[in-house]
Amino acid sequence: MLGEIYSGGLGVPENQETAAKWYRKAAMQGNDGAQYYLGECYYLGKGVAENDAKAVKWFQKSADQGNADAQYYLGECYYLGRGIAENDAEAVKWLQKAAEQGNADAQTLLATCYFRGNGVLEDERKAASLYQKAANQGHAEAQYWLGNCYRFGWGIKKDPRKAIEWYKKSMDNGYYEFNIYDSISFVLYDIIFEMEKIGTSFQKIARSKELAEGIQYAEYAINHFDCENAEDGDIYITLAELYRYKNLDRALDYAEHAVALGVEDANETLKSLRLANGTFGNIGRFLSGIFD
């Protein structure tokens, strides 16, 4: 297709306007691929002025011919209300068609619809199943959400180690948002907490790879993302709890920072650490803060 050649610069200088022109010619002749690509041009403003209504028009024509990519985008338009009135039921209808053809984007968004009950009855098991299908295709966002399913037991048996496995796969595929570092460090802390409950020694935990990894991911997050707010600042509590096994002074510093940010439950963590510090050393710092 000439449009693809100009769009990708395949043997010719890249030219999105020329690509859109050739897509239009083929689309007018009923080519479903060209109709999809022309819709995408309008959706993203590639080679033409962005126009959601025209995007929907061409996505619809292509989707009616069974094009899975167009079906996904048409479903997304209904889901977001872009170029057409928001309609969750219609969104699900088109996402389902695309998902059945193996479109990973559609499987992921359809899973979210089932998870939230948008256009369908809420069904966490079906959501987890769809996230799994997309995740198996390497879809980074689906892998992140599948990690969440394993972390919280949403529609699937809770398994913190599988959660971490899928979080890491998501990162391998380019998902580098703050919440994935936050999630990994918190799940590792949960694993450490379970280790302590079954009698693992303090010294063994302090030397564990789980502790080292938890600190590594959490410290990366605070150094590379804006966590200086009450919502995301809970990662400082995670760091404080992790450092409880390694360095009480640093644990106290992180807990105090969480308190300063107004993080929920930070005061409880700080008091617990001050009690521990009063038991194991630095009694002056313990006494100065325990009655705050």
Language-model-detected regions and their locations in the chain:
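TPR/TPR-like (Sel1-like) alpha-helical repeat modules
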Residues: 164-173, 206-212, 216-221, 248-264
